[in-house]
Amino acid sequence: MKKILFALLICFCIVAKSSYAGTCNGGVEFQGAVNGHTYCRSNSAMNWWTSFGWCKKQGRELASIDQLCDNWNGVSSDNVCPNMMVALDAWSWSSNPSGTYLAFSVNLSSGKLDMAHYRITGAYAVCY
């Protein structure tokens, strides 16, 4: 009986680990303040293109505006993304471009949504 229970416990651990969405090596996991989803923020700032690769390396994807900001109203201003008001004082990239040279970014403490140039290395990757 003990062997059967031990085998079931091992199987459960393997299944639980394999169902996990990805890793967060070189980053910090956090929960969305509104939706409770798990995100991974890089420990290093990087440009927009590098953010895609960093998330892919984690087995995840660079989060879109819809994944970051529930019920976004299309406006770029303060407090439009309460889901990202998580006290990590940093700007983060979204996967959404805005025009030819810009991408949407979100401040992880104020919930402010703005745009930044693709090449700027002052924002962090946030993966979903």
Question: Residue spans of the language-model regions?
Answer:
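Extracellular adhesion/carbohydrate-recognition regions
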Residues: A21-E61, T100-L102
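An exposed tryptophan-centered "aromatic clamp" motif
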Residues: W49-G59, I65-R119, V126-Y128
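Sec-dependent N-terminal signal peptides
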Residues: I4-C13
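Intrinsically disordered, low-complexity segments enriched in glycine/proline and serine/threonine
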Residues: L5-F6, Y20, D70
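Sec/Tat signal peptide C-region and signal peptidase I cleavage site
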Residues: V15-A21
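Residue-level detector of bioactive/disordered segments in secreted/extracellular proteins
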Residues: C13-V15, G26, S42, K57, ...
